[in-house]
Amino acid sequence: MLDDRIRRIVGEHGRLSLDITQLRSDASLYQAGLTSHASVNLMLAIEESFGIEFPERMLRRRTFESVASITDAVAELTGERA
């Protein structure tokens, strides 16, 4: 499932202060400790994992705000169901 895959990547690359398994899909990753530097690493890991490139219009804080927002963006780019 797409959400599970995104959660795994966030858990590995997000450097969160909270356990990703404890966060709701709509919880703010920034409030959970995601920094701007970690968000770039997270974006690169997602791009590599899914073979995609985020277009400039998606390079916004709100795209990486939560697991749900990342999942929606990846679903849009890959055609997979969120």
Identify the function of each model-found stretch.
Residues M1-T35, N41-L44, E48-A82:
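Phosphopantetheine-dependent thiolation modules in NRPS/PKS and related acyl-activating systems
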